[in-house]
């Protein structure tokens, strides 16, 4: 989900069959449409019980500024957590979730790299999530 509409669709879909809490781990890419960041935060706040904001592909942009943009219009949400290290964000969110909860890790999908500070680094959301679940994903 790289767009507000995409994030909204997937969260609405997951919400429809989630018995427990819905957790959302996401960030926005750097050097991309800055205008969508706040709206993605608002959508996550409306549809998810717990939000973890993290780095996606910040590229050459300041990751703190990206997260601040996302967070800027999230008002009175009871659980918004910021962890810039994406692997740690996924691991800790999975560990905080309970049986019956659903954790959405949005943004990178099939990508097996992350652009940070102008460097392409090997990284897989899927591999990190599987490891966090003890290989059960």
Residue spans for each PLM region:
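ATP-dependent carboxylate-amine ligase
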Residues: 1-137
